[in-house]
Amino acid sequence: MKIKSREGETRRKAIGTLRSTASRRWVAIGYTLVVFVAGVAAHRLGVLRGAIDLLSPRTITTVTRRLQGLTTTPERLIIDIKHKDFMNLAHQREVALKRQVLIVSDADVVNANVRYAGKTIPVKLRLKGDLTDHLEGDKWSFRIIARSDSTILGMKQFSLQHPQTRDFINEKRYHEAMRREGLLALRYEFVDVTINGKDLGLYALEEVFETRLVENNERKDGPILRFNEDVLWGELARQESVAPRDRGFVAGSGGYFSADIDAFQTSKWLATPAGRDQFLTAIQLLSSFRTGKVTVAEAFDIKKLATFFALSDLFSAWHGVGNWPNARFYYNPITSRLEPVSFDAYNRTTPAKPGLLALQAIDERRDRTSRRYISQFFADTAFYRLYVSELERVSAAGYVDEMQRALAPKLDPSLKMLRREFPELEIDWQSVRRAAEFIRIALHPPQAVQTYLRTAAPGELVMDVANMQALPLRIIGLARDTTVLPSTPQLLGGKDDSQPMQFTTIRFPVPRGFTWPNDTLETPLRVRYQVVGSQQIDEAPAMAWSHEGLGVAQLRVNAIRLAP
């Protein structure tokens, strides 16, 4: 008891001491010092900064998006590959990484099983992808073909690849935009993949070119053509000492004009007389276009092709349409014309910037064979006219807004799903709006022609006119005040920005009594013109003097006169 009394008395004294003003002050000072020292230590160790970062808006957004993504239920594919076959694939991968190019053959295909929706489906499987970005990390790219009569997600053949290899959600947006315009588009989804018990997360699933693709796009079955790339990649694969993207054609055997034209499912089309006829007709059309024997309209559905090119410009998506190895064309047996199929839209190594395929066609810095391939289309005035008309339509105010609203039900669930692994992803519609603005400016720059007077005579003005930019123009007349003086339309070709202007002499009929120029060099006369295919008429001022000034001969005479 005494001991307890003594302990109680000690406790009461301690409490009394703490209650004193002086003691409270010292306790506060001591506490502050402890907190300060702890704070310094935490700062040095990065603990405090980590805590602050953990509560930052960016971190909260990331966590929220990941959690939202976890509420999604992507289709799940469980792939079982025998150990021996998997090691064979791993060896192929190592060889490809050394070459920095993947070369595959029928001997590289292995058997596997895919478990999906409660069923086990036998498949054939191989690695896929040309460059080795398809083989980096754990998410290797695969081509899968369901055996016998089986299908997976309604497809007989498809590819599985890291979503990044096709620029995540942007590839799906491109296909859905094409589908909305009535063009042939692949099915493109995101699925959860497990291989031999290892959960690899989300893959992009891309439909492969075969009958079901055509039927899913509500077309009658017909061959899908391509330019065979085997020689191209074989030539590039041998250049092992050169970085992949710096490799080129040594002798040209892997180029556009040398590539064999082939079809997917060739054996199927050659199996029957009717199929063989379609196959040969389709190849003849594409071959004749390549050699310049037929026009664009004679080989292709020219309206669909123009829309395809214009939409690719709107989405800055040229990797497929602008490079001949990626070109895919469906032969429509009803119209006997080729139609483009959207595929492999984005070059994920180079950020997309606004531009036009028409400009790429004359850009001398571009790969020569791909430029020649594209320029064949734009050499056809009828196609160029439709292309520009489609550019005006898809770049008009409101088109992108309507597209965004229409595609939201398709894209938003996929984006939410992707954010399970890639929470920073957005659907960037502002870049599409910037591309639309670029198109409008390219079609209607502040001034597209320069015009100078050569001679003036009763009833006629002779003018030198030059196109200042890349798109071809139609010169359609003169205007002064409210008076319009039409002339026979004359076409002026475009030019690359590295080339000088080329002046063309054009005669403009004018009414009798029309006087120009007057005593002053200022003139109200304007040249009226249109970009080929555009509905808009633009004007530019005409100069009342020669673009050559005094002329070279007169300059030489003056130089002699002024010589000492």
What are these model-derived regions, one by one?
Residues 10-11:
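Short polybasic linear motifs
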Residues 2-4, 14-564:
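Phosphate/dinucleotide-binding and metal-coordinating scaffold of catalytic cores
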